[in-house]
């Protein structure tokens, strides 16, 4: 007798940053979840830089944490240098960043995942998705012939779909350097009638720290008082390290310019579009010929390794050129290259094939998250994995979907940008993408999103109790400032809320929750601007409440040009607000559409 395959509620394909969040979310909510990866030892591998967070990216990590995700907690537990960025500017753009011990990050993430009773992690290659008679996903087929039936499948394959690496003139198929690509699944997905593209990313060489003259570089220390990512973290206790700053030279320029004909980026060998905001070092010298030098950062990859990541020197140049390029930098003349840099091309879907839940519009039960959707970055991948996991769980449980609006979080901005505008190049989050960034701060991510995580069943009792305590303290302290002379003093730019700490402890009767003082201070000093943004957000929410019916026909609407009809028909926006964000759709066209909806569909 042939044994029946074990059935799961959800199968997650891939165990990168998106896959880990998706799998853990589904399992934590109570779904039987299988996460399938081609290498169990590389769960949550940091394929590129050994860091979490950064400008806007730190906001995403806080939002992952506020919802009940895992990235922030793991990062806090293995971080080896923490810095709060942009502190010379306003609190809207403050953002935490931390260097990670890459090996410990993998180990800790695997430990967290294996502690989930509803989650099973399997080492295998998924060769294909399986479908029922009405083209709904109902599981996966493994390369060894086994099947795993499931109610939903979340694909988080990163750069593995038909991945092709480039080092100079040399090319080879891989998902990451030294790892096999996912060609069978990639070929099946490309045959399913969806729109795909090729994107490209790259990574720099790694050096042996013992061969570096560290005295030639400027040391960069972390903050004396580290800022954690997770609202659950008290203090960062782990040993902290230094990074170092250096610069390219005229010799670096000469080496690269002479080798440009050998660059796969400029020879036509690489066809995929690379990230605009993280260009390769050769691209920097070509596109910015007047810039005298470019900054690099030497970042240790861990506490028990000599391997050093050269941030700012991503390249796909031939290995001999990379050796000469490294040696052209003061302090690296004798540096030994452990691993060369390389570029990798991979398949990515046009994210306009998805809806706000990250489910493929035309294939029920199939969700996509991470680099497969055209994004770059661990943090962008992590939040997508969490959203896909939450929505797969909600769908299987018959609950309403989890939709985060543009006024509620950077998570909502990321998803809305992807499914409305597409991704012609790897998408990276910036604070400038937010209409209301003073409202979307790192200190209030819990106030914005923890109630949503609680309703979805993801936020734990511990997180919920801490959040409620902070909200009670905030109400009490805000009222106290409003009725005391200290309230007027606090509004002054030069006055710090920490000056009132003894009085605050007296008012609260206990020590304030972490982050509370930052929130109260910001809302006092920027109250007028925040109120103005709240009025603007209310208007945006009104436009989001004007729903456009599923399958709505744009053809034949008087006053809408054929071009705009085509754009709207391709994206299929769900609301009038989303329609207004479709590239090329004018305010006049939105007014016409609003009028037509009112006349023919009725008031919202």
Swiss-Prot record:
Its cofactor is FAD. The keyword Flavoprotein applies. Keywords: Cytoplasm, FAD, Flavoprotein, NAD, tRNA processing. FAD binds at residues 14-19, 126, 182, 371. One of its GO terms (molecular function) is flavin adenine dinucleotide binding. Its main location: cytoplasm. GO terms for cellular component: cytosol. NAD(+) binds at residues 274-288. It is found in: Cytoplasm. The keyword Magnesium does not apply. NAD-binding protein involved in the addition of a carboxymethylaminomethyl (cmnm) group at the wobble position (U34) of certain tRNAs, forming tRNA-cmnm(5)s(2)U34. NCBIfam families: mnmG_gidA (TIGR00136). Belongs to the MnmG family. This is tRNA uridine 5-carboxymethylaminomethyl modification enzyme MnmG. It comes from Solibacter usitatus (strain Ellin6076). The gene is mnmG.
């Amino acid at each position: 007798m042939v044994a029946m395959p074990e059935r799961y509620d959800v199968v997650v394909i891939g165990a990168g940053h998106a896959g880990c969040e998706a799998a853990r979310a589904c399992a934590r909510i109570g779904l039987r979840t299988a996460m399938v990866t081609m290498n169990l030892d590389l769960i949550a591998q940091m394929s590129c830089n050994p860091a979490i967070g950064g400008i806007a990216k730190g906001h995403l990590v806080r939002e992952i944490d506020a919802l009940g995700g895992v990235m922030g907690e793991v990062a806090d537990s293995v971080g080896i240098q923490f810095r709060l960025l942009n502190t010379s500017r306003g609190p809207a753009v403050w953002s935490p960043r931390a260097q990670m011990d890459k090996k410990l990050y993998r180990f800790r993430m695997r430990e967290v995942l294996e502690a989930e009773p509803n989650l099973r992690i399997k080492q295998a290659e998924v060769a294909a998705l399986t479908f029922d008679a009405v083209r709904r996903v109902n599981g996966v087929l493994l390369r060894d012939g086994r099947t795993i039936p499931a109610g939903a499948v979340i694909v988080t394959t990163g750069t593995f779909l038909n991945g092709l690496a480039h080092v100079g003139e040399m090319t080879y198929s891989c998902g990451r350097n030294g790892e096999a690509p996912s060609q069978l699944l990639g070929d099946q997905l490309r045959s399913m009638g969806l729109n795909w593209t090729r994107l490209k990313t790259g990574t720099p060489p790694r050096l042996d720290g013992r061969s570096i003259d560290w005295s030639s570089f400027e040391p960069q220390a972390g903050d004396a008082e580290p800022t954690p990512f997770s609202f659950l973290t008290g203090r960062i206790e782990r040993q902290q390290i230094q990074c170092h700053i250096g610069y390219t030279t005229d010799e670096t320029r000469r080496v690269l310019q002479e080798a440009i004909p050998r660059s796969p980026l400029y020879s036509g060998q690489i066809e995929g579009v690379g990230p605009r905001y993280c260009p390769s070092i050769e691209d920097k010298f070509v596109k910015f010929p007047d810039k005298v030098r470019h900054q690099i950062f030497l970042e240790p990859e861990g506490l028990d390794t000599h391997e050093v990541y050269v941030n700012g020197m991503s390249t796909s140049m031939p290995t001999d050129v990379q050796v000469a390029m490294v040696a052209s930098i003061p302090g690296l003349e004798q540096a030994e290259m452990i691993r060369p840099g390389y570029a990798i091309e991979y398949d990515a879907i046009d994210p306009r094939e998805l809806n706000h839940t990250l489910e493929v519009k035309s294939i029920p039960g199939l969700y996509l998250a991470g680099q497969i959707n055209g994004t770059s970055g661990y943090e962008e991948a992590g939040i997508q994995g969490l959203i896909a996991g939450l929505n797969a769980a909600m769908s299987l449980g018959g609950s309403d979907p989890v939709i985060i609006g543009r006024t509620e979080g950077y998570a909502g901005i990321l998803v809305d940008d992807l499914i409305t505008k597409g991704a012609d190049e790897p998408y990276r989050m910036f604070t400038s993408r937010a209409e209301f960034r003073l409202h979307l701060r790192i200190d209030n991510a819990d106030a914005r999103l923890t109630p949503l995580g609680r309703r979805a069943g993801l936020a734990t009792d511990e997180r919920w109790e801490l959040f409620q305590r902070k909200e009670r303290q905030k109400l009490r302290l805000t009222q106290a400032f409003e009725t005391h002379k200290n309230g007027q003093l606090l509004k002054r730019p030069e006055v710090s809320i920490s000056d009132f700490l003894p009085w605050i402890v007296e008012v609260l009767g206990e020590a304030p929750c972490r982050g509370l003082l930052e929130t109260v201070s910001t809302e006092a000093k920027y109250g007028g601007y925040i109120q103005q943004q709240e009025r603007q957000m209310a208007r945006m929410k009104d436009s989001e409440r004007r729903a456009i019916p599923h399958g709505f026909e744009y053809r034949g609407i008087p006053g809408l040009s054929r071009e705009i009809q085509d754009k709207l028909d391709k994206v299929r926006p769900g609301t009038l607000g989303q329609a207004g964000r479709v590239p090329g759709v004018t305010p006049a066209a939105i007014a016409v559409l609003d009028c037509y909806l009112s006349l023919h569909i009725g008031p919202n």
